[in-house]
Amino acid sequence: MGIWQGQSRRKATGGKYKIVVKKHKKEMGRESAETHLTDDTKIKIVRVAGGNKKVKLLRTNYANVMDPKTNTCKKVSISNVVGNDANKHYIRRNIITKGAIIETEMGKAKVTSRPGQSGIVNAILINE
């Protein structure tokens, strides 16, 4: 069964709306690509609206970390997910989303990209 993101057929009171238009393909959704921290890298290319392509990062172990002091970027390996405000269970499952705090070779970094949408993990080094 697909994920549908259109208007609900029921009102808040439980009554039904009168159906005026049918369901459209543009209202379809997909399951989120929860980027896991593993030893290998796996991506999935999906066709989206307008014939464009979206690169979903499913598994990874590297991140592009920028050091704001030296203004340089370096590809480093990720060792652990330390914090994630999106969901507290993502820390235990090592799932990387935008805003997650990751432990890298350079130190702790905050993820600035959306790995499930852009296909890459970009992060900025945080000072503690």
Curated annotation (Swiss-Prot):
GO terms for cellular component: ribonucleoprotein complex; ribosome. Disulfide bonds: none annotated. Keywords: Ribonucleoprotein, Ribosomal protein. The keyword Ribosomal protein applies. GO terms for molecular function: structural constituent of ribosome. GO terms for biological process: translation. Pfam families: Ribosomal_S8e. Belongs to the eukaryotic ribosomal protein eS8 family. Part of the 30S ribosomal subunit. This is Small ribosomal subunit protein eS8.
